[in-house]
Amino acid sequence: MAQINCIDGDLSGNLVRISNAIEEATKKLADIILFPESALLGWINPEAFRRASPIPGKESEIICQLARKYKIHICIGLDEKDGDRLYDSAILVDDNGNIILKHRKINVLPELMAPPYSVGEGVQAVQTRFGTIGVMICADSFRDNLLESMQKKKPDLLLIPYGWAAPENAWPAHGQELIKVVKKAAIKINCPVIGTNLIGQVSHGPWTGQIYGGQSVAFDPATNLLLIGKDRDKDLIIISLNLNN
């Protein structure tokens, strides 16, 4: 879990922090690294309508190059431009630098940005050498129907980039709510769930000023393994899992 500091609109700086986290993770022999939601431009940032790229495109190719360079699987949330539409997307890139899965967020919370993100269709999972890996994004994990759809795909691992924010005075307690959400998803789908949050602050829309407080969560229902990232500080959490592949 790469719980990094993401600064809204600081695309080049966020790429530096992403690259540094990947380099550190490979030194710790990680096979897969999971970053937060909208890790390049920031969640609910209307500037993304102008600055985001298609997928595949310029920014996703940089992620693919990093995967090839460091021989690691990367899952990351990226804003995706498709014509006039903007999607809150996530990609899974294999260690050869190929995008093997792209998910577009479905539960986009349209009241938080005008115009809002476009709504994705369906959940997906892909076969890898580690087993079947599914990907959802943040508030997708709130919806029972989406968890049920993912359950039917029988993933061995579910990766969820989060943008988990709350007012400053709600932290650190707000991290307990993320634990509940991740645990519920893991128990419902019957596989380990990894949820990576970021460090930062919402800078646009009605949630302006709210804090992304970290406390990323990994939970394995088979072993009751629970790992939690640092409160309101960057962290790189290494998890060892025996997947059912």
Locations of regions flagged by a protein language model:
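A cross-domain feature marking catalytic cores of carbohydrate-active enzymes
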Residues: E37, L78, I137, Y162, ...
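CN hydrolase (nitrilase-like) catalytic-core segments centered on the catalytic cysteine
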Residues: P56-C75, F142-D235
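Cys-nucleophile CN-hydrolase/nitrilase-fold catalytic domain and related Cys-dependent amidase chemistry
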Residues: L11, S19-N96, K102, A165-C191
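Active-site micro-motifs of SAM-dependent methyltransferase domains
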Residues: C6, L40-L41, R143
